[in-house]
Amino acid sequence: MVEAGTRDPLESALLDSRYLVQAKIASGGTSTVYRGLDVRLDRPVALKVMDARYAGDEQFLTRFRLEARAVARLNNRALVAVYDQGKDGRHPFLVMELIEGGTLRELLIERGPMPPHAVVAVLRPVLGGLAAAHRAGLVHRDVKPENILISDDGDVKLADFGLVRAVAAASITSTGVILGTAAYLSPEQVRDGNADPRSDVYSVGVLVYELLTGHTPFTGDSALSIAYQRLDADVPRASAVIDGVPPQFDELVACATARNPADRYADAIAMGADLEAIAEELALPEFRVPAPRNSAQHRSAALYRSRITQQGQLGAKPVHHPTRQLTRQPGDCSEPASGSEPEHEPITGQFAGIAIEEFIWARQHARRMVLVWVSVVLAITGLVASAAWTIGSNLSGLL
């Protein structure tokens, strides 16, 4: 896949007046995935935008809508949720759950082959998601590490259901072209393009081999030569490549990748049951699958955040404060005074050139003068009242 780097013409576009395209995550042969925002619900989303050549292909658009609706009806935490689909101008698009993390391919590149307990931790949700789809009559057709996402919280989810079928229905797709990823195709997909749940089982079997050994079972000079090898050769035993692989995993891969579909597990449900029996027999510990550290999704998120920061810095205006700003330094908040020091310091200094002490004396002097005058007034009032009472009481004698 081609990673996001420079600016893309669709970035900052608003698809269908609702979905803001923020930054490219990765692109492939038929589509580009962006991180985006549903502005109506204020929800982060992943936007898979199909190549513009499909915009006028009614056969593709019809199948694209049907597959999107079918997957949206599935309710399984191991499947990347589909929220919406649409077409904005020259771009059919799919709106999906945004997984903050990376792909299983990126994890394999970072860490290499996995021990059996880690393989089981990956396969459980993958087979669980496929089982839900198989019960609903859906087939993935393109199970591979690139379509298995790992969140930063350790959730493993399967993505891109039905996309191969939609591309196959397009009138621009040449007859006889093998669709899917050559390394993971089942013999029947290579032979005649047919697929059913057992085809997904074959792809998972190849995936198990790759997780245990670090590479796919068939190699060649071209995708076509790799695809055709599985018509005449069985997938080899992983234990022949990596020491310590339990024979139960060899048997799991052999049963999943039998060249005759009738000899395989019937669907993901049957394969999942066998996987659980193996995990119990070997007493494999529980394991949380880590997300890749340097994923395209993480880089896309960092790029978008840096752009937002730059825009904020360029657009920021200085704030004017007409009043004085006081900045408290770390040392300003001192510990309470010890008992040997006075609790209150004497007030010193000046105000308008006059010593503070003079203000204090003046205020105290003014208070004393007020009290003196109040006492004088009260005394005079008392004398007058007393005289009036005396005169009033002797008035009859005088008369």
Curated annotation (Swiss-Prot):
Span of domain Protein kinase: 19-278
SMART domains named among the record's database cross-references: S_TKc (SM00220)
Keywords: ATP-binding, Cell membrane, Kinase, Membrane, Nucleotide-binding, Phosphoprotein, Serine/threonine-protein kinase, Transferase, Transmembrane, Transmembrane helix
InterPro entries for the chain: Kinase-like_dom_sf, Prot_kinase_dom, Ser/Thr_kinase_AS
Gene Ontology terms: cellular component: plasma membrane
Annotated segments matching region Disordered: 312-346
GO MF annotations in UniProt: ATP binding; protein serine kinase activity; protein serine/threonine kinase activity
Ranges that cross the membrane: 369-389
Keyword check for Phosphoprotein: yes
EC numbers on record: 2.7.11.1
A biological process term (GO) from this entry: regulation of primary metabolic process
Post-translational modification comment from the UniProt entry: Autophosphorylated.
Catalyzed reactions per annotation: L-seryl-[protein] + ATP = O-phospho-L-seryl-[protein] + ADP + H(+); L-threonyl-[protein] + ATP = O-phospho-L-threonyl-[protein] + ADP + H(+)
Transmembrane helix found in the keyword field: yes
Extracellular side: 390-399
Active site location: 142
Its membrane topology: Single-pass membrane protein
Cell compartments where the protein resides: Cell membrane
Family, as annotated: Belongs to the protein kinase superfamily. Ser/Thr protein kinase family.
Record-given protein name: Serine/threonine-protein kinase PknL
Organism, as annotated: Mycobacterium bovis (strain ATCC BAA-935 / AF2122/97)
